[in-house]
From Swiss-Prot:
One of its GO terms (cellular component) is cytosolic small ribosomal subunit. This is Small ribosomal subunit protein uS17. NCBIfam families: PRK05610.1 (NF004123), uS17_bact (TIGR03635). GO terms for biological process: translation. SUPFAM superfamilies: Nucleic acid-binding proteins. Keywords: Ribonucleoprotein, Ribosomal protein, RNA-binding, rRNA-binding.
C-alpha cells in the first residue's frame, strides 16, 4: 500500500502526557439515517509523535501506518495549527 492511499485525519490533540504518543480527537458530522438531523461524532486515536513536537490543543494531521503498539495505528504528519497559550 502506497503512502498516498493511507487514511489521513485532522484532529485536536487532547493529551500529550505520554512519551512519543499523543491522543487526537477527530470530530465528524453525519446525517441521521432516518431523521436526517446532523449529528456530531468524535473518536479518539493514539498517534506516534517521534520528536514530541505536538502539544495539547494543537490541530494536527495524522496518517495511518503499521501497528506501532497495542493501540497505536497512526503517526503524526504535521502540526497544522499551534494552540494559543493564554
Amino acid at each position: 500500500m502506497e503512502r498516498n492511499q493511507r487514511k489521513t485525519l485532522v484532529g485536536r490533540v487532547v493529551s500529550d502526557k505520554m512519551d512519543k504518543t499523543i491522543t487526537v480527537v477527530v470530530e465528524t458530522k453525519r446525517n441521521h439515517p432516518v431523521y436526517g438531523k446532523r449529528i456530531n461524532y468524535s473518536k479518539k486515536y493514539k498517534a506516534h509523535d517521534e520528536n514530541n513536537v505536538a502539544k495539547e490543543g494543537d490541530i494536527v494531521r495524522i496518517m495511518e501506518t503499521r501497528p506501532l503498539s497495542a493501540t497505536k495505528r497512526f503517526r503524526l504528519v504535521e502540526v497544522v495549527e499551534e494552540a494559543v497559550i493564554i
